[in-house]
């Protein structure tokens, strides 16, 4: 199976292209920058997608309807995260990112080196000075640079953690999200998805206050099986089969169902420091029960 987390755009090129336009979603930048600075960066990134063909429509801007939905959620101790969403669709997400790729290739002095490892990052006296590049044939050369940006995505997350440890850069465990993908008839979720497209809801359980949240909602979408190969520098010991959800922009491709992920988020403390391996191990146990595939329950 293809490794969908690598090469140009990684998983982003093979997703249904939801752009979440809120500082409350998708990371912790507000821990390092002011809210205004983060919003400026989100707007800048969003404008890039628009320049390369993303649709202009944004869901979740009707404050009155959002207020009504949030009020209804509050009756059940559910918090609705306000988040405008621009949806490109599975069939157009790839095209938008390909347009970016084609644009960059035309820039003088800009070069893509596919199937080339940048490892190790060269560090001299505590200062990064470049990286060693190794192509698919095993030919290596050292490249000098004033700045090295390491952005390997999910496929290289464990590799990046190893680089940080190697250079004595402190890291912090992210939450570990374990859950299932739920599929229901559109009629169950239409009152949410027609206005918000994706309803991001958070609930804390009564007994242990476990954080439960919805994620990656796909109105009229499909559930797909995906395989994550061993990954960046064979980060993973074996391929794992997981589920994802997609939704197309073209209404002719819509189904009668809506799917979404329901995740339990857990923050571990010391001495635990392997959140990626933990999540992968849980997925591998599920694959073991099915002989290597995904598990379906009705």
Feature names for model-found ranges:
Residues 1-32, 59, 63-298:
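Residues forming the flavin
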Residues 33, 37, 43-51:
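Conserved catalytic/binding loops enriched for acidic/polar residues
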Residues 55-56:
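Compact, glycine/acidic-enriched structural inserts
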């Amino acid at each position: 199976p293809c490794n969908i987390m690598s090469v140009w755009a990684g998983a982003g090129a093979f997703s249904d292209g939801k752009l979440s336009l809120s500082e409350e979603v998708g990371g912790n930048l507000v821990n390092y920058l002011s809210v205004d600075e983060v919003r400026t960066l989100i707007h800048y990134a969003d404008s890039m997608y628009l320049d390369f063909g993303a649709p202009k429509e944004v869901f979740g801007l009707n404050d009155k309807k959002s207020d009504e939905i949030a009020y209804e959620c509050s009756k059940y101790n559910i918090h609705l995260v306000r988040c405008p969403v621009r949806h490109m669709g599975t069939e157009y997400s790839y095209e938008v990112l390909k347009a970016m790729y084609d644009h960059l290739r035309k820039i003088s002095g800009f070069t893509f080196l596919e199937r080339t490892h940048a490892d190790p990052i060269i560090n001299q006296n505590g200062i990064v000075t470049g990286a060693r590049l190794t192509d698919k044939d095993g030919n290596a050369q050292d490249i000098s640079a004033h700045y090295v940006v390491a952005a390997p995505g999910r496929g290289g997350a464990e590799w990046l953690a190893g680089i940080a440890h190697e250079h004595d850069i402190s890291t912090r465990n992210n939450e570990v999200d374990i859950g299932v993908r739920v599929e229901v008839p559109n009629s169950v979720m239409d009152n949410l998805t027609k206005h918000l497209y994706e309803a991001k809801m958070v609930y804390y359980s009564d007994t242990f206050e476990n954080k439960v949240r919805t994620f990656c909602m796909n109105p009229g979408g499909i559930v797909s099986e995906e395989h994550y190969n061993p990954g960046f520098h064979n980060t993973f010991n074996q391929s794992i089969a997981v589920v994802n959800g997609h939704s197309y922009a073209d209404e002719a491709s819509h189904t009668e169902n809506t799917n979404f992920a329901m995740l339990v988020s857990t923050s571990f403390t010391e001495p635990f420091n392997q959140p990626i391996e933990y999540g992968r191990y849980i997925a591998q146990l599920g694959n073991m029960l099915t002989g290597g595939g995904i598990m379906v329950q009705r």
